[in-house]
UniProtKB/Swiss-Prot annotation:
GO molecular function: manganese ion binding; metalloaminopeptidase activity
Membrane spanning residue stretches: none
Lineage: Bacteria, Bacillati, Cyanobacteriota, Cyanophyceae, Synechococcales
This protein's name: Probable cytosol aminopeptidase
Top-level taxonomic group: Bacteria
Organism: Prochlorococcus marinus subsp. pastoris (strain CCMP1986 / NIES-2087 / MED4)
One GO cellular component term: cytoplasm
Cellular compartment(s): Cytoplasm
Keywords: Aminopeptidase, Cytoplasm, Hydrolase, Manganese, Metal-binding, Protease
Family of this protein: Belongs to the peptidase M17 family.
GO BP annotations, alphabetical order: proteolysis
Function: Presumably involved in the processing and regular turnover of intracellular proteins. Catalyzes the removal of unsubstituted N-terminal amino acids from various peptides.
Length: 491
């Protein structure tokens, strides 16, 4: 899907589908804006019949079969003094989602004078495109419905020079993440994930290194490889690098959990554990690769960015790791495995150590790590932990700009006692209470403490069972926009 703008005289506009935003005050004068395409007096009568006065979130649909304008969607924006971009994005998403299989091109005309910045308008474009997303790869039946392939913004006035290139790049990154998360585990294997990473490298000029099992053994990655032992599929350790063409002012590592399927191992997922949904246990790596795709196109100067994914499956066979085994991570720490279903943190242990050895200024890891974070924050908000107050502030700002909810959680040091082992340096899980916190405390043991670090648990946000805001039901691609915005803010 592409974005376009129309800045000419509206009387020359040739579109057939229009979304028109309207505030509560003085409907008659506002409707004059579209008098070029429809009799505004007649339209006002129809609107009054429906008792509509521009209330926030209310939507009116009109179909015209005997005019050039075929469809008109009117979105109520509420009082002009209280206009809210997030409300607009959600209403726009709702309209676009319902229209995306009926129209090939949709035009949008809002009271742009009430919008504060071009970034807000870009976010409207983002909302429109991402809400129209459909994934029919695994459906044998191909319908003949239309596909929305263009969003046009009319008369942007003071924002007439707006550029939607970066918006398109970010949407492409989110869409890649959604496709990866939604792909079934017999389709998205560790090998396939490495192929997808190689394609990103080829398309955008990134360097790539894929470590095979024997190379991971040489690096002492006993935690990551312990998880992979039960699968017939070889693990793939993926390292993408986006280099800067100018002197590097900051080096960053983004690390994603990459379990392409998680059975739970010998602590098998049963009952309400939703084993059939464990294809999305690589949501963190999907966000990292989606960010790599977007940033590879944007090419932020002065930054060297490393994208790291330890991809594997957690399965059961005669070689699989046992509950009670003691393993050694690549930083030399020994770990007693008291739960094979807490495998993501084991793969991240070696991935974080690897990232730390690159000597970055900061590391962010993303993972569908704990059910505890879903209990704490639900499905709309991800939790994050960090060892640096400035990083916390920067992430909150970036997530707010990106429209992805993020809530800071405590690194409660007293909870570390729950990870003590009688026979090893630590256990891989603590008690049930505070489970997402002890998971973060576990990860904190695997990188240089002088590095700024944040851990984002996206277990609740990477998937939605129903349409939610800009997300159609299914994979959300959560995390891509926040990561990209956080990087963009450093330019």
């Amino acid at each position: 899907m592409q974005f376009s703008t129309f800045q000419q005289d509206l009387n020359t506009w040739q579109g057939s589908s229009l979304i028109f935003g309207i505030v509560e005050e003085d409907l008659k004068n506002q409707l004059q804006k579209i008098n070029f395409i429809i009799d505004s007096k007649l339209l006002l009568e129809k609107i009054n019949q429906k008792k509509f006065n521009g209330e926030k979130g209310k939507i009116l649909n009109f179909d015209f079969f005997d005019q050039r304008l075929q469809t008109l969607k009117i979105i109520g924006l509420g009082e002009s003094k209280n206009i809210n971009s997030n409300d607009i994005k959600n209403s726009l998403a709702d309209v676009i989602r319902k229209s995306s299989d009926k129209e090939e091109k949709i035009s949008i005309l809002f009271p742009w004078e009430l919008i504060n910045s071009p970034e807000e308008i870009q976010s409207f474009g983002e909302s429109a495109r991402l809400s129209a997303y459909k994934d029919n790869r695994f459906n044998s039946k191909r319908d003949d419905k239309k596909v929305l392939n263009e969003i046009e913004f009319l008369n942007l006035n003071k924002f007439k020079n707006i550029n939607f290139n970066e918006t398109e790049y970010i949407c492409e990154g989110v869409e890649l993440a959604r496709r990866l998360v939604a792909a079934p585990p017999n389709s998205l294997t560790p090998l396939e994930m490495s192929i997808q990473a190689s394609k990103i490298a080829k398309d955008h000029g990134l360097e790539i290194k894929i470590l095979e099992k024997n190379e991971c053994e040489d690096l002492g990655m006993g935690a990551y490889l312990a998880v992979a032992k039960g699968s017939d599929l070889e693990p793939k350790f993926i390292h993408l690098t986006l280099k800067s063409t100018s002197p590097v002012k900051e080096k960053i590592a983004l690390v994603g959990k990459g379990l392409t399927f998680d059975s739970g191992g010998y602590n098998l997922k049963v009952g309400a554990s939703q084993i059939e949904m464990m294809k999305y246990d690589m949501g963190g790596s999907a966000a990292v690769l989606g960010a790599a795709k977007a940033l590879g196109a944007i090419k932020p100067d002065g930054l060297e960015i490393h994208f790291i994914v330890a991809a594997c499956e957690n399965m059961i066979n005669g070689s699989a790791v046992h509950p009670g085994d003691v393993i050694k991570a690549s930083n030399g720490k020994t770990i007693e495995i008291n739960n094979t279903d807490a495998e993501g943190r084991l793969t991240l242990a070696d991935a974080l150590t690897y990232a730390s050895n690159l000597k970055p200024d900061s590391i962010i890891d993303l993972a569908t790590l704990t059910g505890a974070i879903v209990v704490a924050l639900g499905n709309d908000v991800a939790g994050f932990w960090t060892n640096n107050n400035m990083m916390a502030s920067d992430l909150k700002t970036a997530s707010s700009q990106a429209g992805e909810e993020l809530w800071q959680m405590p690194l409660q040091k007293s909870y570390k006692d729950g990870l003590k082992s009688h026979i090893a340096d630590m256990k891989n899980t603590g008690p049930r209470a505070g489970g997402s916190i002890t998971a973060a405390l576990f990860l904190e043991e695997f990188f240089d403490k002088n590095i700024k670090w944040a851990h984002i648990d996206i277990a609740g946000t990477c998937w939605t069972d129903k349409n939610r805001g800009i997300h159609p039901s299914g994979a959300t691609g959560y995390g891509v926009k926040t990561l990209v915005q956080w990087i963009k803010n450093k330019r």
